[in-house]
Amino acid sequence: MIIDTTEIETINSFSKLESLKEVYGIIWMLVPIVTLVLGITIGVLVIVWLEREISAGIQQRIGPEYAGPLGILQALADGTKLLLKENLIPSTGDTRLFSIGPSIAVISIFLSYSVIPFGDHLVLADLSIGVFFWIAISSIAPVGLLMSGYGSNNKYSFLGGLRAAAQSISYEIPLALCVLSISLLSNSSSTVDIVEAQSKYGFWGWNLWRQPIGFIVFLISSLAECERLPFDLPEAEEELVAGYQTEYSGIKFGLFYIASYLNLLVSSLFVTVLYLGGWNLSIPYIFVPELFGINKGGKVFGTLIGIFITLAKTYLFLFIPIATRWTLPRLRMDQLLNLGWKFLLPISLGNLLLTTSSQLLSL
């Protein structure tokens, strides 16, 4: 059987087109992921700068001012310094657990960003169980901290890892119950559906007004999950040197530093999505495109406005955990566990029962 050379060339050209389509498909799949990672990195740098400026204002001192204009590049300078430092590994510790622990903590928090909607149809993965995916993924981070503490072969590190695990278990349950109440109100566990359910009723439709008790419990539980003062017992300097971070240096120590701010940012974003209306401005009589004389059909402008509103609400809310760090003293371990199990858990259960009853009566 003789095959014409033109037929062979045609077949080869089709195979090349198919391979090019596959390459373009992979590139288009990676573009939103890379964009999200870059955006998160910039967001974390902004949080570090904001925290230093706000804490300097609270303490009536001058914050960073030499690294770039207004000290905005100070976080970048600190990160570069950590990259250049020596990466020490304890000789008597478990090398694999010691090395894997920080990566697990960072990756698990990074995955949480995939279900956060930054605007209308601007979410990496609109899952039907989005909020519970976040809770499930965030519960993996303490496992990484426990591995780091155990792998360090240091009593202070191990005790810090145990505290992190105990604290996470104590406050995950009230947090999950508050999220379940929001899901019942919105008739969905998708983050996009929850935002759209709030937008139906405008500013007064925010879950902040419909779930004030749940909001307070969620706020306290998220602070505990982020290990921020007054809940920073896993790394209490006066008791545990630096907790599970004691034996770390260089880039691995930097990963823990990044993980804490990533967790703070993702918690604030979920407060915005669950309680503050997400990307919707929700102010009566004001529609942003009309305010600037732009047609409602401008999708690009609408997307940018949605991102801006989401981030504005998030960074305004961030003032609360930052100010709390420099205002309240650290709790004792027994006080922390009592607060979680004896107060927040019954309150969140009662809030869930009230929400369920109101939803049943409204049927």
Swiss-Prot record:
PROSITE patterns: COMPLEX1_ND1_1, COMPLEX1_ND1_2. The chain crosses the membrane at residues 30-50, 98-118, 127-147, 165-185, 203-223, 248-268, 300-320, 336-356. GO terms for molecular function: NADH dehydrogenase activity; oxidoreductase activity, acting on NAD(P)H, quinone or similar compound as acceptor; quinone binding. GO terms for biological process: aerobic respiration; photosynthesis, light reaction. Keywords: Chloroplast, Membrane, NAD, NADP, Plastid, Plastoquinone, Quinone, Thylakoid, Translocase, Transmembrane, Transmembrane helix. It catalyses: a plastoquinone + NADH + (n+1) H(+)(in) = a plastoquinol + NAD(+) + n H(+)(out); a plastoquinone + NADPH + (n+1) H(+)(in) = a plastoquinol + NADP(+) + n H(+)(out). NDH shuttles electrons from NAD(P)H:plastoquinone, via FMN and iron-sulfur (Fe-S) centers, to quinones in the photosynthetic chain and possibly in a chloroplast respiratory chain. The immediate electron acceptor for the enzyme in this species is believed to be plastoquinone. Couples the redox reaction to proton translocation, and thus conserves the redox energy in a proton gradient. This is NAD(P)H-quinone oxidoreductase subunit 1, chloroplastic. The gene is ndhA.
